[in-house]
From Swiss-Prot:
Gene3D superfamilies per the UniProt record, alphabetical: bsu07140 like domains
Family: Belongs to the UPF0702 family.
Organism expressing this protein natively: Bacillus subtilis (strain 168)
Keywords: Cell membrane, Membrane, Transmembrane, Transmembrane helix
Membrane-spanning residues: 32-52, 60-80
The keyword Membrane belongs to this UniProt entry's keyword annotation: yes
Cell membrane is among the record's keywords: yes
Membrane topology value: Multi-pass membrane protein
Protein name: UPF0702 transmembrane protein YdfS
Localization per record: Cell membrane
GO cellular component: plasma membrane
InterPro entries: DUF421, UPF0702_alpha/beta_dom_sf, YetF_N
Length: 235
């Protein structure tokens, strides 16, 4: 009976989607890059075809679904290992506002309209562009905003120390055990300086997952071996 077959196929397709979710990992829609979004839509389309298209044999759809999941998994795995590949699929964040000035060339590249930019700022309770030090369009399409010091909410730290008026974006120095030489050159930093800073901390480049020069001049370093017990996400 065709109705019973559709029910079975629907349950099977839902089960395949759950398995795919377990393999590919947890991610919300708001965190998706363009690649993630395309992959999710394609998997959904294949699963939908398995559910209602009775003219196609179930095992053919299952094979197609499995191959696509495997392809996505391999690309994601390689992207974690290789920063250039990750940038190819996910892209780079784009600065849209710098020191209260809109960067029109970047807006055009991203096909980002002023109306949408103003909407995103209003959602963050910003009604004056001059309050913005940096506005960055992330790879997942979200807009992150850093206000100028005089327009930020007061914190306990602000009440204890004076605000440093000189502000800049953090500078990524090392990612996945590799020095980001382009960032060093653009910011007039040298590799010898970076290596010396790591030596002071008794850390090697290959041991470093992520190192960034913060806006206040401090260097944040995260190592592969943190020796931290994570209580969450254990099954």
């Amino acid at each position: 009976m065709i109705e019973l077959e559709v029910v079975i196929r629907t349950v099977a397709s839902f089960g395949l989607l759950l398995i795919a979710e377990r393999i590919l990992g947890k991610q919300t829609i708001s965190q998706m890059t363009i690649f993630d979004f395309i992959a999710a839509i394609t998997l959904g389309a294949i699963a939908a075809g398995l559910a209602y298209n009775t003219s196609i044999k179930p095992h053919n759809m299952a094979i197609s679904f499995s191959i696509f999941v495997l392809t996505i998994f391999l690309i994601s795995f390689l992207s974690i290992k290789n920063r250039k590949l990750r940038k190819f699929f996910a892209g780079d964040p784009t600065v849209l506002i710098q020191n209260g000035k809109i960067l029109e060339s970047n807006m055009r590249k991203m096909r980002y309209t002023l109306d949408y930019l103003n909407q995103q700022l209003r959602e963050k309770e910003i009604f004056n562009i001059e309050e913005v030090l940096f506005a960055i369009l992330e790879t997942n399409g979200q807009l992150t905003v850093l206000r100028k010091p005089q327009f930020r909410h007061v914190t306990k730290q602000d009440l204890m120390i004076a605000v440093n008026q000189e502000q800049r974006l953090p500078i990524e120095l090392i990612m996945d055990g590799e020095i980001i030489e382009n960032n060093l050159k653009q910011n007039r930093l040298t590799e010898s300086w970076l290596l010396e800073e790591l030596r002071k901390r008794d850390i090697k480049v290959k041991e470093t997952v992520y190192a960034v020069l913060l806006g206040n001049g401090d260097i944040y370093v995260d190592q592969y071996k943190d020796h931290i017990s994570v209580p969450m996400d254990k099954e």
